[in-house]
């Protein structure tokens, strides 16, 4: 599935563009997704993930090993 963060599950949201005259038209708010490679020392390989910026902060805080363990517990293929 496109435009979904594998760690946080963030997806596009729907909202309105609001003009100065208060006219409203539908728009999508897209998550800030980035492709990042992480070296996993225990597996001796690179892992490429599509992450939101919030997920990058989570990995900085908890470490890639912990995040990958959570993904595998949820049944994600990494």
From Swiss-Prot:
Transmembrane segments: none annotated. GO terms for biological process: translation. SUPFAM superfamilies: L28p-like. One of its GO terms (molecular function) is structural constituent of ribosome. Keywords: Ribonucleoprotein, Ribosomal protein. One of its GO terms (cellular component) is cytosolic large ribosomal subunit. Pfam families: Ribosomal_L28. Signal peptide: none annotated. Belongs to the bacterial ribosomal protein bL28 family. This is Large ribosomal subunit protein bL28. It comes from Thiobacillus denitrificans (strain ATCC 25259 / T1). The lineage of its organism: Bacteria, Pseudomonadati, Pseudomonadota, Betaproteobacteria, Nitrosomonadales.
């Amino acid at each position: 599935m496109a435009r979904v963060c594998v760690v946080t599950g963030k997806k596009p949201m729907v909202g309105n563009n609001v003009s100065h005259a208060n006219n409203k038209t539908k728009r999508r708010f897209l998550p800030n997704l980035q492709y990042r490679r992480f070296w996993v020392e225990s597996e001796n390989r690179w892992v490429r993930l599509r992450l939101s910026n919030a997920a990058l902060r989570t990995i900085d805080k908890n470490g890639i090993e912990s995040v990958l363990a959570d993904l595998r517990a949820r049944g994600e293929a990494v």
